[in-house]
Amino acid sequence: MQVGRNCHFCPYVLIDLIYPDRVKIGDNVTIGSNSMIFAHSNPTANLFLKKEQYPRTIAKVNIKSGAVLNPGCIITAGVTIGENSIISVGSVVTQDIPDYCVVVGNPGRVIKKISHNEV
């Protein structure tokens, strides 16, 4: 795992325990309590699913500088969170988020682009 300078991790943050080397966190990032960052997914942990139909995913996660992940966020494998983007409480991010965006919901969706005047 790579962590930049001046980052703040609140209690109970979980960063992928199996592939932590696939997680990169930029400078000045804040991660709220009970947030989870996964660099892999393993749908075949369910014995009733056929492994060929649901392959294991292992992919890098990149959280760029200045991003804020509010409490309870889940970031899935292969996602990039853009610079200075804000992920709202409890959001589940399954796809890349551009720079300077506000994301809400499950699945997470961009609801606002932050102008440079607001930063």
Regions found by a protein language model. Give the residues of each.
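Extended, small-residue-rich solenoid/repeat segments and analogous flexible loops
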Residues: 1-7
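Flexible, glycine/small-residue-enriched loop-and-beta-strand segment within the central core
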Residues: 9-80, 106-107, 113-115
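Flexible glycine-rich beta->alpha loop in the catalytic core of nucleotide-sugar glycosyltransferases
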Residues: 42, 80, 91-92, 98
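Conserved G/P- and acidic residue-centered "switch" motifs that form tight phosphate/ATP-binding loops
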Residues: 87, 105
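Short helix N-cap motif at coil->helix boundaries in the Bergerat
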Residues: 95, 112
